[in-house]
Each structure stands twice: as C-alpha cells, then as structure tokens.
C-alpha cells in the first residue's frame, strides 16, 4: 500500500495568446493549483508576433507542454486581423471603441478556439478550460460576454463523453467582470511578466501604440500610474 501512487493533480487547458489577459489567466490557473496545459493558435493572424510572447510566457512557468494549433483563417477573412486589405482602426478613443463591433472582430474566433481547447481537455482528462475573455473592457466583441460563456458551458456539458457522464469540463473565465486596470493589478499580484506579453494588432516587431489593443493597454497602465514595460514605436 505504501508504494501505491494516487494521481491527484488537476489539469487545466489554458487559451494563451501571449497577451495581457491570457497571460494573467495562465498565472491564475497555476496559482489555483492546476497542472497547466496552454494552447495557442497560429491562424495566420496579422499579429502572429503574439505567438512568440505566448511561448516566452509559458516558459516562465515551466508548463508540461505548450500546444500550438495551426490553421488558416485567411481563407475567408472577414476581419482586419485575417485580411490585410482591411485597415486597422487607429487613434480611437475608448468611447469610439465601444460604439460598434470593430473590424478586428474575427468571426466566431472564440468558438473555434474553445472547440479545440475542449477536445484537448477531454483527451488529456483535464477538468478545466481557462479563457481570458473580459466583458467590461471588450471592444464590442460578442464572444467575450457572460451569456456567450454560459452558452459554451452548455456545449461542453452536452457535447462530450465526460459531460454526458456527469463530469463536464468547466470553463473558467476569471477576468470576465474585471476592468483592464483590475486585470493588471491581479497580474501584478501573480507576478505576470508584462514585458514578455504582446497586445499589438499591427503585425510588426515593435508595438505600434495606436491600435485599439495598444491604446486599451496603455490607458490601463497610465490610469494606475504605472509604466508599461513593453517598448512602443509611438507613445502619446
């Protein structure tokens, strides 16, 4: 009996883009006591530079394995992130960002991502899928809202063997009710290395400072009286 090893560690799959939110969520999952299995997506996005940050952030925690799934959403485009003929919004105010669903919305992206994460989680017998969606500072994205996450949880329950047997994989969205400033404060508590993260949509090796994602990030650091350690090509 003394030599009997009981496997008790809980596993979690974490959607990791390399950005501020998803990096915080990875660190939160680790703090919650899970064996972390990050999954990232190379969908030929304009800002593929984020994948390098995802790799670096995952390395800081010494994760078991970092999966990168490859597919090409340029096949049908529909977003400034997958179709370079669509211009990225620049220099917009926070009020302007909140008016409409922006051209940086990628059609059904989180549904695609969560489907891959669900399959991966069930294959490795993980109990949780962590995602860094945020409903308060979202740029109009419909798949970052509480009702969407609730609907996807139902899919997790009904669409898997694990769910039908009464032990559904649960979606954890710890940032969904937090403002961007609160996410940064949480990340500071968790020790997230902001200098390794990436938020810019522009697709270059230096953050532009003027796209919506950069502006949201810079505004949050500024509101807290903090300097964003990420270098920018252009600062206000």
Name each model-derived stretch.
Residues 198-219:
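Local cysteine-cluster metal-coordination motifs and their immediate loop/turn environment
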Residues 90, 219-223:
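A polyampholytic, Gly/Pro-enriched intrinsically disordered region
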Residues 4-190:
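ATP-dependent adenylation/nucleotidyltransferase module used to activate substrates
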Residues 187-189, 194-203:
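Short, intrinsically disordered, charge-biased short linear motifs at domain edges
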Residues 203-204, 224-236:
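Short cysteine/histidine-rich metal-coordination sites, predominantly Zn2+-binding motifs
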Residues 160, 222-225:
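Short amphipathic alpha-helical interaction/hinge segments
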């Amino acid at each position: 009996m003394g030599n009997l090893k009981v496997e008790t560690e809980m596993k979690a799959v974490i959607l990791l883009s390399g950005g501020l939110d998803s990096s915080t969520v990875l660190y939160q999952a680790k703090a919650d006591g899970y064996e972390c299995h990050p999954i990232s997506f190379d969908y030929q996005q304009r800002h593929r530079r984020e994948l390098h940050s995802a790799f670096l952030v995952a390395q800081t925690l010494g994760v078991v394995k970092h999966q990168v799934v490859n597919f090409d959403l340029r096949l049908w485009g529909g977003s400034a992130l997958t179709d370079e003929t669509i211009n990225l919004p620049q220099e917009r105010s926070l009020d302007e960002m909140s008016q409409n669903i922006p051209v940086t919305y990628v059609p059904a992206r989180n549904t695609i991502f969560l489907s891959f994460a669900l399959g991966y989680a069930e294959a490795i017998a993980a109990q949780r899928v962590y995602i860094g969606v945020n409903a308060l500072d979202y740029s109009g994205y419909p798949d970052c809202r509480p009702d969407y996450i609730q609907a996807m949880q139902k899919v997790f329950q009904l669409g898997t063997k694990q769910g039908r047997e009464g032990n559904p994989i649960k979606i954890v969205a710890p940032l969904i009710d937090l403002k961007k400033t609160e996410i940064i404060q949480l990340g500071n508590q968790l020790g997230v290395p902001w200098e390794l993260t990436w938020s810019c949509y522009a697709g270059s090796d230096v953050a532009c400072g003027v796209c919506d994602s950069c502006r949201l990030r810079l505004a949050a650091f500024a509101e807290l009286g903090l300097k964003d350690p990420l270098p920018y090509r252009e600062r206000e």
